[in-house]
Amino acid sequence: MNALLEVRGARKSFGGVHAVDGVSLSLAPGEVLAVLGHNGAGKSTLMQMLAGALPFDGGELLLNGSPAKFASPADSRAAGIETIHQKLALADNLDSVANLFLGRELRTRFGLLDDAAMRAAAVPLFARLNPNFKNIAEPVQSLSGGQRQVVAIARALQFKARVLIMDEPCAALGPSETAMVHDLIRRLAAEGVGILLVTHDMPDVFALSNRLMVMKNGRLVGVTQTAAVTENEVLAMIIAGKAPAAPL
């Protein structure tokens, strides 16, 4: 089976700073790959490259085994890659359905917003993600942090995302909402969605990821099966740049 997404030798520089320096990774369908490293390690730059916000200076990107190049975030989204930012980028004054279709609204043949069609598409999607999510008519500013994550993930899936880049999805959530988001991520993976989980939270890493990769100073320290390492070994990778004994 081809990797859903593969990066070979990615490079990105800003002046004399090598923000991403020869980094490679692969992501299989249904896999959760944790992307780790201190601030400034190059994680965000690499994710912006995959999201089409920054061009590659070198290296290669493949989707389902075929080379891909993005000139804009719209190209990345059209290829099935969606990014869920830590701040979620939701319009607080709009309800969940309006956020789901924000910028990609359905319209009638007369050019008017087709509210009925958008609601009809939204209801089963929200039910699929969280059967207890009933507040689709309320402004998202009134929703809890976990419910807002549901809206952001639903927006990505509505447009056939096959790869999700998730930036700190459980930041500032309480235990019950963290558990809800964990369950949601596991169900998405079970459906074949590949997930790049950018996080500093070790419990999230060990609860969710199949593999983890660590970056430091723009370079790849190593990649390993999450179950094959301890938290202390992962911290050694992050802090000291010490690769695991048996990278996978």
Q: Locations of the language-model features?
A:
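Glycine-rich phosphate-binding loops of nucleotide-dependent enzymes
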Residues: N2-L248
